Amino acid sequence: MYSLRDRQKKFQAALLAISTNETPNGLAVYRNNVRGNLTLTLKLAFPATLKLIGEDCFHAYAEQFVLAQPPRNADLHLYGEAFPAYLAASALAGQLPYLADVAWLDWAVHHALHAAETPPLDPQTLAHAPESFSFIGHPSLWLLALRRDAQAIWAAVLEEDDNRLAGILPDDSVAPLIILRPRGSLEIIELSPAMFDLALTLESGFPLDPALAVIGEEEAAQALGLLLSYGLFSGITPKATEELPCPPR
């Protein structure tokens, strides 16, 4: 006897499987609608990627992805996070080494735009903070370390600026970015490597004092002030002091 979970898995597999002559007509229509909606979801979440590789190519990869990794959540705004990694493993990535990073930037922007509206942390809150605490990352925050040319390509493709796109030279140096929407407007900000490491450490939930050791005492106050001004955090939570797993030498 099938459990409810088994029945749900079987129904999901039937919806996403390739149609055959044995497929009931009603299910075939529903299946095509489901797959079409999931493919459309990916197109909306990855606009620059879509324009970069073209409608037909994107559609082919999106359909493969839908079959390989169907959604696990009813909220389709959450569907597609694994798509950049899927593209990175594709043959197309060998021809377009920046492709996956363009897709990651698409996803980070999509995430920021659909995150819950949340005010950023007021720096004055720190005056009354407990002795040891960690920051709560802003819901819209996404941290990315991309190829530098990927960011330029992403912008040029969305602006449909062919001249600008043609002038972009290959550049695989790293651009550490934060993507967020703390005050209603989308922001894409490049950080120094040290600032990015600090942001990543704090966003991961490490207490403030050991996290500041990553960047050094001289720059710590200024760096923290900048991160707060950017709106990276939405709150703080008390936390016991703990050591970083890989303390700086």
State where each predicted segment sits:
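Low-complexity, glycine/alanine/valine/leucine- and proline-rich hydrophobic stretches
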Residues: 140-204
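A general structural signal for short secondary-structure junctions and capping/turn motifs
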Residues: 101-102, 132-136, 168-170, 225
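Short connector loops at helix/strand junctions that flank enzyme active sites
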Residues: 78, 136-138, 173
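Long, charge-rich, low-complexity alpha-helical segments
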Residues: 1-128, 184, 189-249
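Surface-exposed beta-loop interaction hotspot
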Residues: 119-140, 146
